[in-house]
Amino acid sequence: GSAGSAAATRLSEDPQRSVLLLEAGPDYPDFETLPDELKFGYATGTDIMVSDEHNWQFTGKANEIAETMLVPRGRVTGGTSAINGQVFLRGLTDDFNDWSSEGNKLWTFEEGLPFFRDLETDMDFHDDFHGSGGPIICHRFKRDDWLPSQTAFYSACIEAGFPAVADFNQPDSHGVGAIPCNNPNGIRFSTALGYLAQARHRVNFTIKSNCLARRLLFNDLSVTGVEVESGGESFVVEGEQIVLSSGTIANAQLLMLSGIGPSDHLQEMGIDLVLDLPGVG
């Protein structure tokens, strides 16, 4: 997942920790070795969508009668941030506050704002809501650079009464305007570029690519290791602490393969139950 690169980089800042990052897909150790479809934000979507080298090629349906659609998920260091459309929008303020109201006061938008600021360098805005020294570079296309269709859409929205928005990452903004993007000079600035690049030289940090996590290993309800497959061989990786950061879909998938999830579904799939947790998946 995209967050795995950030978590591993931050954890390895402590030289007393030994950090291992397992990646199911390939890893590219420097910018020059990145394939063009990952490097450039305006590469054709076909390359990424068709190839399974960097994309899990998941599909899904919105409902029973809808047509099957692609659900692109990154299979490379940087996760889906390495193949996505580089839209750098924060979540809605009300969503964060709704989550917090369920019991965790640290999930409010106000509590999360310092982390949003820390992860970005915003090229356009320099105020209390934006960062200036973070690893991910953010910008907005100027009106002179818009396509004719974008200019026409903007003008039509203004004529229809929608307010103009200069910054969609400003809390409570709504209307029409340029979206923030993390693709300076056309480069897709993934978390692999923004975070991992600064950590690769650390002696306490190791990246192992093409290592697929098959399941988590437990001692009672404590995770002690991961069963991994690589090059047709299986082996176990153990650690004092295991951080699961496999993305929106694979996190739930790996938990269920490991026996954590709704008991009836796990039983149906022939998976031994570790913990009945209906919310998983």
Residue ranges and their predicted role:
Residues G1-G281:
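N-terminal redox-cofactor-binding region of secreted/periplasmic oxidoreductases
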